């Protein structure tokens, strides 16, 4: 653990001295294709070796013409495939069957989108994205080089640029910030950044947290039928951002209650033990400036959801 911290700290100092993150991103991204280039030549030699014995029997023209002639007539429909899969020629019908077995599964996945109201398509696509959670990381903030500032988080030597919006812009100054947790959802941006996210920065836990908040759900479908459901939401952080809370709750509602199917309006109300509350409106994405807001996760009392 100490070696990892030292490595990340040295990398942080390197970023601060150079002041150029773009070069680091190129270096980080350059490492990934190198691995694919090393594996690529390993896959090509066996293919050339398979073709090489085919060229040798061709040198003896009399026997080769007699053997190749029936092979071409049998596989005349797919001549290129016979050259690639000549050894497992008996198994060639099996991949054809596997592709057919996949096709009946595709209609089942297509049945879900047909039930989705087009006006909820973008919201459903966003809140079903994969998310990432980085804990006890080092955040590096350099001088502003565009309209907004970024915290650079470097887990596994890949740089994620977290936009400092809302309260984060004044909360975090330039330099190195330790013991940082970040909840990441990659988003489109105008900066040509592949690993870009907004808000979701919190302080790492000082102790273990295992808190569960009850969730009461009332749903009215497009036919006016009202249903009720009860579930719970697990919280493992002392501090939790509204970005993480909003994203995880909506994703849970999509999976269990078909949010953004035929209905996608309503609200989520987070009720605190001290009487405060926070509201998420389901008909729109959480505002970017609120993605930086942080609340006490252990102080959440219960959550009420109304879907209509």
Swiss-Prot record:
Give the residue ranges for region: Disordered: 28-117
Which residue windows does the record flag with biased composition (Low complexity)?
Answer: 77-93
Gene3D superfamilies membership: 2.40.50.110, 3.10.20.120
Q: Which GO terms describe its cellular component?
A: extracellular region
Q: Where is the composition biased (Polar residues)?
A: 33-47, 55-76, 94-114
| One Pfam family it belongs to | Stap_Strp_tox_C
PROSITE patterns tied to this protein: STAPH_STREP_TOXIN_2
Q: Which UniProt keywords apply?
A: Secreted, Signal, Virulence
Which coarse location class describes where this protein primarily resides? secreted
- Please report which protein family the annotation says this sequence is part of: Belongs to the staphylococcal/streptococcal toxin family.
Q: What does this protein do?
A: Secreted protein that plays a role in immune innate response inhibition by interfering with host TLR2-mediated pathway.
Q: What is this protein called?
A: Staphylococcal superantigen-like 4
